[in-house]
Amino acid sequence: MSAIGDKNQFRIIVGSYEHNILCLSLDIPNQKENDAAKTPHFMPIFHFQAHSLSIKCLAVSRRYLVSGSNDEHIRIYDLQKRKELGTLLSHQGSITALQFSHPASSSEDAAVSKGSKNSKWLLSASEDHKIMVWRVKDWETVGTLKGHTARVNDVDIHPTNRIAISVSDDHSIRLWNLMTLRNAAVLKLRKYNTNGTCVRWLGAKGDYFAVGLRDRVLIYETGSAKVFKEIVFQRKTLMHIETHILPFDNKEYLSVGISDGNVHFYPCEELFEKVEENEKQEDDDDKEDISPAFSLLGHTNRIKDFKFYTNEFGTYLVTIGSDGKIVVWDMSTKEQVAVYDCGERLNCLTLCDESIEKYNTMKKRDAETADIGDQSEVESDTEELKKIMFGEKKKLNKKKRKQLKKSKVSVELE
């Protein structure tokens, strides 16, 4: 991810219960500038009603923006041209999650993604118990991942793009082989009375994954497929989880959004530490809450979604809440950078580069083209105007022409 020139800019796209999509460009001034110019500036890019019901999820891959809604539709937009490309209609239930595959970043990934810098697949989850796999090149359906018997709440793709993981209201976690589009494994949540609401892979190689329940986070080891660590929240509801490498210590953190407006940060290194068998038995008898390394409070009520953005200027956390506010944090200082009140009930969020939009591909008209184009048909054709006003002149034959010449009278003055 990169900024434009010397400007620290990126775009924030949010979806709301009011069926709208709002895109804002955030300009964060550099510290070298004078005090008057140090105030961050939000500039609206577009704001429109995208669906007939509330928007549940958003995802971005380079130039493409996709949105999922309770109206069972997935809409595709080209951010470079600010144009809607179409609608995906295969689901028969509300869209609950959208996830693009990872762009190829190594030789191993390039073999999977065929060297393309853009995402190859889009995964969409729905209340119809299905996960659809779409080919981004032509937006055709590659296949359907079937196996869940209830609403699919979330889905995430492994860093290798070969495996996906999903959680559902059927009280299970499923692993999918994206090479064969078949179910690879099923994990049951037998010891817990709540369903998984969100899931994320952990570690650079995806050796672990985190499953968020209503009141706790379960840390699984991928190899053994067993829970070896739990983060419990007393009298609080988990809303969302993400993972990212933070700049102040260059380590990966698991971030957890809570219903009280807080985002808690847990170092993944500590979560990955093995627990001895005797200690594990004691923990089962008397569990102690794992305390976060630090927390950020930016909302008065529950957090709905949050994402991280990294460019040459630093790493930023963007959170949205039911209070309608967008809060931006600088993770190097752990301080708020900017706040924007949308006046709507926000539900989902995604981020993209400011350079995503190519102005030369947009439909623009210069002054001369605009002047010509704005003229009416009558104004642009003077000959047609004369015909309408005075009638069309009839062509004269040779005899009539001679008669006109003879009838002409010449007058000379003495």
Curated annotation (Swiss-Prot):
WD repeats: 50-78, 90-135, 147-177, 189-221, 238-267, 298-330
An annotated Gene Ontology molecular function: protein kinase inhibitor activity
Membrane topology of the entry: Peripheral membrane protein
SMART domains for the chain: WD40
Protein name from the UniProt record: Protein MAK11
Miscellaneous information on this protein: Present with 3730 molecules/cell in log phase SD medium.
InterPro entries (UniProt xref): G-protein_beta_WD-40_rep, PAK1-Kinase_Regulator, WD40/YVTN_repeat-like_dom_sf, WD40_repeat_CS, WD40_repeat_dom_sf, WD40_rpt
Domain of life of the source: Eukaryota
A GO cellular component entry from the record: nuclear membrane
Lineage of source species: Eukaryota, Fungi, Dikarya, Ascomycota, Saccharomycotina
